[in-house]
């Protein structure tokens, strides 16, 4: 899935924390499979991860394979990357200082490493919303 800036801004806005009186609106930027699952720590951590877990997004502008690389970590452990075909808009937002959040949306036992984990990325659009 390739998202350009306009497509990214036309996606769904949701509330980050329904229990909170003041929340910031979030923009769903993308839903992607995890790239590189078989090369990093995902296999060893599989039994500990759960759908809904928070993921850390780490921008790697000096990555020799892809200058738009965005690494995906879980509790300080490297799991892989946002796929190269999906990382342009996210890298641009992160380079401009936008706050991005990610969470696991799917965990599936599969021989195909591209089907093992999916995640969503949200941008904090910085607007507090009163409930």
Identify the residue ranges that each predicted region occupies:
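Conserved active-site motif detector
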Residues: 2-131
């Amino acid at each position: 899935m390739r998202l350009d800036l306009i497509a990214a801004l036309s996606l769904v806005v949701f509330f980050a924390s329904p229990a909170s009186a003041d929340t910031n609106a979030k923009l769903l930027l993308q839903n992607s499979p995890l790239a590189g699952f078989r090369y990093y720590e995902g296999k060893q951590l599989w039994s500990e991860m759960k759908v809904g877990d928070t993921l850390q997004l780490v921008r790697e502008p000096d990555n020799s394979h892809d200058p738009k690389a965005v690494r995906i970590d879980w509790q300080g452990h490297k799991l892989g990357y946002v796929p190269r075909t999906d990382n342009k808009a996210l890298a641009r937002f992160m380079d401009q200082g936008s706050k991005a959040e990610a969470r696991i949306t799917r965990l599936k036992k599969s021989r195909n490493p591209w089907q093992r984990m999916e995640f969503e990325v949200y941008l904090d659009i910085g607007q507090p919303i009163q409930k």
